Design a protein with these regions (language model features):
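Conserved active-site alpha-helix within GNAT-family acetyltransferase domains
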Residues: 133-150
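Conserved GNAT acetyl-CoA-binding A-motif
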Residues: 120-131
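GNAT-family acyltransferases
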Residues: 1-94, 153-162
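Hydrophobic residues in beta-strands and at strand termini
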Residues: 99, 130, 160-162
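Short coil/turn motifs at secondary-structure junctions
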Residues: 83-85, 102, 133
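Conserved acetyl-CoA-binding loop-helix of GNAT-fold acetyltransferases
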Residues: 96-99, 105-119, 138-143
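Short aromatic/hydrophobic contact patches that present stacked aromatics
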Residues: 4, 96, 127-129
């Protein structure tokens, strides 16, 4: 199962928007993102992703957004935050990931998180969270070495030692 991460850029906006709009009718279960309705809204979101990767607004931390692909087909999204503020220590963590509905329950979530962890080779550990109701995500996190350290207002907070 060969996946690749491609950082956000404006060049593949049409494919990326199509993927996000395929998620609109479902609960994206804690992956905090408003689904754009059209290309104008999406370009605004992409520009925010690009800005947030280098120069986030006050109170926010740098965050890189990657599209997860297999053979140039988007199957998910990963958000990477190398540093955390107090809020992200409770909800969000260092890594956020989303697997498209057609690719769930096939091992992609586990592989996506494993590959995302490799981006943190200079860290001793990462924090990752998910909704208490998201049992599949809890399994993915545990399968990648996650240890539950607390629950907080419906969110599970895990630590993964690297």
């Amino acid at each position: 199962m060969e996946i690749s991460f491609r950082q956000t850029s404006l060049k593949d906006a049409e494919r990326e928007l199509f993927f996000l709009q395929s998620l609109e009718s479902e609960n994206i279960n804690g992956f905090q993102m408003k689904i754009p309705k059209n290309m104008k809204e999406f370009e605004k979101l992409l520009n925010k992703f690009i800005k947030d990767s280098e120069n986030p607004d006050s109170g926010r931390v740098p965050q890189k957004v990657y599209w997860v692909e297999i053979n140039e087909k988007i199957i998910g999204i990963v958000k990477i935050r190398e540093i955390l503020n107090e809020n992200l220590k409770k909800i969000g963590g260092n890594i956020g990931y989303l697997v498209g509905k057609d690719y769930r329950n096939k091992g992609y979530g586990k592989k996506i998180l494993k590959d995302a962890l490799a981006l943190f080779r200079n860290h001793k550990y990462i924090i990752i969270t998910c909704n208490e109701s998201n049992i599949p995500s809890q399994k993915v996190i545990k399968d990648n070495g996650g240890k539950l350290i607390e629950t907080n207002n419906g969110h599970c907070v895990y630590k993964i030692n690297l």
